[in-house]
């Protein structure tokens, strides 16, 4: 079942607990029956057959609970492993990552990209990698971990990030202490205006070059975000942030319609869920208020959106 991102309370944690509990219960029933009760049933059958002077005959019918457990255990165990350690589906319910991700996109998140974690307590079991600049990541919202957010990694640990006049500036971490990188604007190339409309305004589309990743962003032509509303880090200006070790600075691609690190700070490594790698299907939900069908019923399928996420 796909979980919504940035759309309200998430049932993912409860679903994981239910999956783990069902896997343990059905597996335990199957195991106990195989080791304890199945041999007893066969012994009774053999004794009855010997008394009648016949062979073993047919196996006795399994108890309903055992039969059900044997049938569903492999299925839910497979789902548990797939969802907890490999890939998990999510639904995009908001436009904060437009134009990269649209409302109605269903995406796959690679759960093992930044470490293998246990499905209940989310403690890291195996190190597999760290986010790179430009990755689109799903994470637990630091201010309310029951909610999953999706944003793009802009600042890595040790980086200095400045956001001024809708422009992102980055000074990468100085690794050696000599010839340290300087603060530079992230290159932007204007693409078009008018494909997306918000608040009656035609949004401007740019291509942003983060060095290893090129991706498109949207800007509102009029709306300005005051630094007064930004998260203030002690010792820095209101529009400047120094990314702490083990944390990340993230932004939405729809820059003037996204609540991200500018407003609430950094994403700890422990909050990372995984890397968004693909759109597997995309639905349109464009119903008028007078339509008799509920709003969650799709009005169309955007097959052309299926593919990798960049």
Q: What is each stretch, according to the model?
A:
Residues 5-8, 12-40, 49-53, 57-65, ...:
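Soluble "head" domains of membrane/secretory-pathway proteins
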């Amino acid at each position: 079942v796909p979980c919504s991102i940035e759309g309200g309370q998430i049932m993912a944690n409860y679903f994981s607990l239910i999956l783990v509990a069902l896997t343990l219960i059905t597996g335990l029933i199957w195991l106990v029956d195989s080791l304890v009760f199945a041999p007893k049933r066969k012994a009774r059958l053999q004794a009855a057959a010997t008394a009648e002077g016949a062979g073993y005959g047919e196996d006795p019918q399994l108890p309903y609970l055992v039969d059900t457990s044997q049938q569903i255990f492999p299925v839910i165990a497979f789902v548990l492993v797939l969802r907890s350690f490999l890939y998990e589906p999510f639904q995009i319910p908001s436009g904060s990552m437009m134009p990269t991700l649209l409302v109605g996109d269903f995406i796959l998140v690679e759960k093992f990209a930044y470490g293998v974690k246990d499905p209940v307590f989310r403690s890291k079991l195996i190190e597999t990698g760290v986010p790179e600049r430009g990755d689109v990541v799903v994470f637990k919202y630091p201010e309310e971990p029951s909610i999953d957010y999706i944003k793009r990694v802009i600042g890595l640990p040790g980086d200095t990030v400045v956001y001024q006049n809708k422009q992102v500036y980055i000074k990468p971490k100085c690794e050696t202490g000599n010839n340290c990188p300087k603060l530079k604007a992230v290159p932007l190339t204007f693409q078009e205006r008018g494909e997306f409309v918000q608040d009656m305004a035609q949004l401007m589309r740019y291509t942003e070059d983060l060095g290893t990743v090129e991706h498109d962003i949207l800007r509102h032509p009029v709306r300005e975000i005051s630094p007064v509303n930004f998260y203030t880090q002690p010792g820095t200006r209101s529009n400047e942030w120094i990314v702490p070790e083990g944390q990340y600075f993230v932004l939405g691609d729809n820059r003037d319609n996204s609540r991200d690190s500018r407003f609430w700070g950094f994403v700890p490594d422990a909050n990372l869920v995984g890397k968004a790698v693909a759109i597997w299907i995309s639905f349109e939900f464009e119903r008028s208020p007078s339509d008799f069908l509920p709003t969650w019923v799709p009005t169309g399928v955007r097959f052309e959106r299926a593919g990798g996420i960049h």
